[in-house]
Each structure stands twice: as C-alpha cells, then as structure tokens.
C-alpha cells in the first residue's frame, strides 16, 4: 500500500499538489482517505495555509463548528 502522505523533494504531498492544481475533487478524496493537513512544504505551508495563501477560498468548508482555525504569523492550527 502506498503512503498517502509521501513528500517529494519540495516536501509537497499529493494533497499539496492537488491544491496547487485546483483539483478540488481529488483534494477532497485525499482528505477522506486520511491525508495529513499538518505536513509542511519547503516554504513552510500546510495544505490549509496553501489554500489561504493561493486564495482558493472555494476549497474551504466548515463541516464541524467545533473546529476553530487560528491564523497567526504564518501558523494555522485546528483544535
């Protein structure tokens, strides 16, 4: 079985690449399969930070009101 969170030489995961290419269905599929939202790329972006940085706000969904997103000086965490 392949590691869904494998990173390339730029530390991009498949989820990072799906976001860069605006492949929203694939990104959603990867999240459903357990892709990590915590891994950072070479620039220090997690997938969620990348979504915000690139302005892909259509990808942001609030499925759970208990999740609070904090944006602090290039740091995003969920609790």
UniProtKB/Swiss-Prot annotation:
Keywords: ANK repeat, Repeat. ANK repeats lie at residues 10-39, 43-77. InterPro entries: Ankyrin_rpt (IPR002110), Ankyrin_rpt-contain_sf (IPR036770). It comes from the Bacteria. It holds the Pfam family Ank_2. This is Putative ankyrin repeat protein RC0860.
